[in-house]
C-alpha cells in the first residue's frame, strides 16, 4: 500500500502573544517529510481559558478549495495554501471540528453549545442548532445565525465533534458522555455512551471510533465483534523541547485529538 500525504493543523499550548500558535502542515508519510505551509501567529488571539482561540483545527475540502477553522473564523485557501477568503459569525466561537456534506459545511460552535451550517455556494452561515438538556432528554433548537435570536454563550457540553454523511448528522462533546444523532424532525437521540473527555467520536464500520483521551488511546468499539485500543505514542522526556514548563494551558503527552480515516 502506498503511504499517503496528509494535511494537519496544530495548536501550540503556552505560546505568548506574537508567537506561533500552530499552523498547517503537509505530511508526506512515504518520504518521512513534514513541510509547514501556514504559520498561525496572528496578534488578535484570545488568551482567556485553556487553549481557546489558539491554533487552527478542523479541515475540509471542496474540489479546488481547502477550508480550515480557527476559533471564531472560517478560512478558505487555494490548493497552494494561498488565502482566498475568511468568514465570521457572532455565533461561531471556539470552533473545533468541521464536516462537509454536498454544499454545506457543518462546524462545532463549542462556546455556544451549537452546530452551525455554512453554505459553500452562498458563502454565508445559514443555519444553527443549539443543544441543551431537559432532565435526561436532549433538546435541539434551531436558530438563524444571521439574526439576533440565537443562544447565549454557555459552553456547557463543549461540543467538539460533528460528522455528516449519508446516514445523517452525529456529534459529541467533552461533557455529553454520549454520541448524539440528529433526526430529520430535529430530535436528538443517543447512539451510544462515551467516556468523559473523549474527542472525535464517529460511527465507523458498524461501531464507533474515537480518541479516548483520558485513557491515552485511540479506541474502536464494535457492536458485535472485538474492540481495539491503540496507544497514543509517548516520547522519552529527554527528546522533548521545553519540558518542565508548568502551565495549565500546556497539553500533556499522549493527549489524543484529531482522526482521519483513509481506508
Residue ranges, per PLM feature:
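Beta-rich catalytic cores
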Residues: 20, 55, 94, 111, ...
Amino acid at each position: 500500500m502506498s503511504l499517503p500525504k496528509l494535511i494537519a493543523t496544530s495548536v501550540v499550548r503556552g505560546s505568548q502573544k506574537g508567537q506561533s500558535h500552530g499552523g498547517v502542515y503537509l505530511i508526506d508519510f512515504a518520504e518521512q517529510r513534514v513541510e509547514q505551509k501556514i504559520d498561525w501567529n496572528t496578534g488578535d488571539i484570545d488568551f482567556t481559558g485553556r487553549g481557546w482561540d489558539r491554533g487552527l483545527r478542523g479541515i475540509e475540502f471542496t474540489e479546488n478549495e481547502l477550508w480550515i477553522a480557527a476559533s471564531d473564523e472560517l478560512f478558505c485557501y487555494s490548493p497552494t495554501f494561498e488565502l482566498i477568503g475568511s468568514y465570521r459569525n457572532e455565533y461561531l466561537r471556539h470552533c473545533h471540528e468541521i464536516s462537509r456534506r454536498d454544499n454545506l459545511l457543518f462546524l462545532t460552535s463549542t462556546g455556544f453549545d451549537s452546530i452551525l451550517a455554512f453554505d459553500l455556494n452562498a458563502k454565508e452561515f445559514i443555519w444553527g442548532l443549539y443543544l441543551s438538556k431537559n432532565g435526561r432528554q436532549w433538546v435541539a433548537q434551531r436558530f438563524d445565525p444571521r439574526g439576533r435570536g440565537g443562544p447565549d454563550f454557555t459552553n456547557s457540553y463543549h461540543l467538539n465533534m460533528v460528522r455528516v454523511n449519508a446516514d445523517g448528522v452525529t456529534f459529541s462533546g467533552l461533557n455529553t458522555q454520549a454520541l448524539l444523532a440528529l433526526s430529520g424532525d430535529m430530535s436528538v437521540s443517543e447512539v451510544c455512551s462515551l467516556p468523559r473527555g473523549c474527542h472525535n467520536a464517529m460511527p465507523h464500520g458498524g461501531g464507533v471510533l474515537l480518541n479516548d483521551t483520558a485513557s491515552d488511546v485511540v479506541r474502536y468499539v464494535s457492536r458485535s465483534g472485538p474492540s481495539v485500543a491503540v496507544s497514543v505514542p509517548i516520547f522519552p522526556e529527554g527528546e522533548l523541547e521545553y519540558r518542565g514548563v508548568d502551565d495549565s494551558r500546556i497539553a500533556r503527552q499522549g493527549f489524543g485529538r484529531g482522526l482521519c480515516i483513509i481506508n
